[in-house]
Regions:
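Soluble "head" domains of membrane/secretory-pathway proteins
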Residues: 2-30, 51, 57, 65, ...
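Hydrophobic membrane-insertion alpha-helices, especially the h-region
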Residues: 33-51
């Protein structure tokens, strides 16, 4: 005669099956938690990259030798800029990168040889020290100097003065504060030039 418990699992088998079920449940819980954490971290990284520290790629040579075609840089959104800051700004659905030369209300004068003078009044302009330039040039210029920068705007120029189209030309003009994306602070690519942007 058959025992009525012959087809039933033993208590050890039940315990092993219970442990396997618990393990699968814990594994799914850890996996779900990890995926949620990764999604949250990715979302925060995207928000920071978009709102606080945009990552930009440089196209063209208007900022050489400081920045060259293909460089990847980090910028910081801020509202205060100084003369000498390298900034990114919106222009015709593109982002351009140039250097701040003069601030709102300041006067700018550029000689035919490319020497740049900046001052609070047209009578007290000083020669701008520009160690980042390889060569000076008047470049593509169709405004009359001396020139006073309008309020809420900055006067910008590229470091490769002979090829850069910038505030010296009415096509770009002075950049409004609301057009500014941010100050470029760090180059992340190429790795050979990894570091702060001066």
């Amino acid at each position: 005669m058959k025992d009525k418990f012959d087809g039933m699992p033993t208590s050890q088998q039940l315990e092993e099956e219970l442990n396997r079920t618990r393990y699968r449940s814990r594994y799914r819980q850890v996996l779900r938690s990890t995926v949620y954490t990764l999604i949250t971290v990715a979302a925060i990284a995207v928000l920071v990259a978009t709102l606080v520290m945009p990552v930009l790629q440089i196209y063209g040579g208007s900022m050489s030798p400081t920045l060259t075609d293909g460089d990847i840089v980090l910028s910081i959104k801020q509202s205060e800029f100084e003369s000498g800051d390298v900034v990114a700004f919106y222009y015709n659905n593109k982002i351009l990168v140039k250097r701040v030369i003069a601030l709102p209300g300041e006067w700018v004068d550029i000689t035919p040889e490319g020497d740049v003078y900046v001052g609070k009044t047209s009578g007290d302009m000083q020669l701008l020290d520009e160690p980042y330039l390889e060569e000076k040039a008047l470049g593509d210029c169709n405004i009359e100097f001396p020139y006073q920068v309008p309020e809420s705007r900055v006067f910008v120029m590229g470091d490769h003065r002979s090829v850069s189209v910038d505030s010296r030309n009415t096509a770009v003009g002075c950049v409004a504060e609301e057009q500014l994306v941010g100050k470029l602070v760090f180059r992340v690519w190429p790795l050979a030039f990894f570091g702060r942007i001066n």
